[in-house]
């Protein structure tokens, strides 16, 4: 049986850990694009899915391997859905989780509605011109709190309070996070799609 290799169109170590944990039981080897010399892809679009598709096609084009991209972010109700697709660069360049979190907390000062949700979109393509990309979505409801809590996770996790758990995303174990999170939900949906559409069971 041919080896199942999948390029992850990201150099984020946290994401790589989550992807490997999900796909290893399926016998899929997840390779970060940086290991294969893939250049950064522009993300010029205003929707998660368009940016995701662009990144997946770019990685497939540069590696000749099936590729998967993730585009995700936190969408805050009181800010009209911001940071949204701009989550990674909310406070500008260079990308900084600390600066992004400071800006988000600042923008929510004095607001009583602190509801937010994480969105994750995953796209997988067999090759750069794949006419049938696989698409999976995941969502995670929560609130933005004013102070950080927890040592795990990355991005906005220390400020993303999950009422159902009574703690922030950064306070959850890796197992809890994979079970509850937007990315965990999207990864499970994608795993089912890979098995059904590509035969990667």
Role assignments for model-derived ranges:
Residues 2-7, 13-201:
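Anionic-ligand binding patches
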